């Protein structure tokens, strides 16, 4: 039908659709769509936010159990978790995935040791709440792990940062997350962003990267950050993402206007 989902995509000459998918997702509808012979590309995007969400131990443990079940890897250590995530990363690649996407409040680039991360994993996996410092160290380690995975496969990594979420406690308890009570955050993240990108770049493992800020105050930060890590291997290896969410304004988001900007 003309106004079905597929009909609308054909009507507007869509060539590729990339969905947002968790590492534990089956991707069954991507497989079915491909097998149906649908001419428009339908590709998954790797969104592993829950694998670094260690604020609530019970939620993290429950997610690890899902990851273990879908990957076939028994998880009892940090290395086990990374092995399970790599297996899912491989599966996503087999289904045509070429992009990762990370929804983060800010960039995380704390110093840490392998021993510290192993201990932090054991602590949260065992049900004990982490300190703020431990949370930041774990998130920092996970961003590096994910960045290295993407580089190994030649993927492009995307970072959407700057939202402050679930601000209305009453409505959060009533409706849960992602129900319209998020807003633009204000974070000092330039140094952490630079440190994160620099670590991967120094290791020779910086993947193609797109940076999306939510607070327009960071426009100049990103615009100047891009030039620090271009290496001539491809044009625009590090790019400024288009406006999203509160910045999805028609006067800057139309393709013709984006072409003028570029």
Residue ranges and their predicted role:
Residues 1-184, 199, 228, 239:
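Extended, charged catalytic domains and RNA/DNA-binding interfaces, predominantly
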Residues 56, 184-194, 215-222, 246-249:
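A general structural motif
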Residues 169, 222-223:
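Short, well-ordered secondary-structure micro-motifs
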Residues 192-212:
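Electropositive, surface-exposed helix/loop patches at the edges of structured domains
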Residues 204-206, 229-238:
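Glycine-enriched alpha-helix->loop->beta-strand junction motifs that scaffold or abut catalytic
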Residues 209-219, 229-232, 243-247:
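Extended C-terminal subregions enriched in glycine
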Residues 250-262:
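Single conserved hydrophobic/aromatic residue that forms the stacking wall/gate
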């Amino acid at each position: 039908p003309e106004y079905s989902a597929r009909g609308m995509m054909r009507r507007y000459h869509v060539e590729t659709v990339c969905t947002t998918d968790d590492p534990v997702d089956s991707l069954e509808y991507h497989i079915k769509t491909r097998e149906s012979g649908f001419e428009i590309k339908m590709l998954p995007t790797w969104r592993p936010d829950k694998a670094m969400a260690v604020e609530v131990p019970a939620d993290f443990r429950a997610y690890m159990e899902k990851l273990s079940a879908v990957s076939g890897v028994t998880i009892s250590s940090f290395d086990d978790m990374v092995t399970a995530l790599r297996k899912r990363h491989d599966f996503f690649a087999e289904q045509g995935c070429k992009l990762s996407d990370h929804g983060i409040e800010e960039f995380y680039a704390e110093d840490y040791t392998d021993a510290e991360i192993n201990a932090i994993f054991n602590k949260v996996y065992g049900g004990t709440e982490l300190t703020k410092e431990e949370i930041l160290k774990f998130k920092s380690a996970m961003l590096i792990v994910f960045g290295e995975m993407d580089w190994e496969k030649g993927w492009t990594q995307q970072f959407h940062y700057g939202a402050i979420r679930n601000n209305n406690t009453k409505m959060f308890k009533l409706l849960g997350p992602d129900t319209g009570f998020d807003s633009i955050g204000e974070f000092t993240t330039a140094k952490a962003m630079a440190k994160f990108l620099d670590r991967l770049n120094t290791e020779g493992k910086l993947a193609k990267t797109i940076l999306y800020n939510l607070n327009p105050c960071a426009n100049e930060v990103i615009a100047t950050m891009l030039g620090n890590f271009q290496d001539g291997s491809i044009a625009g290896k590090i790019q400024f993402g288009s406006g999203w969410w509160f910045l999805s304004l028609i006067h800057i988001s139309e393709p013709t206007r984006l072409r003028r900007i570029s």
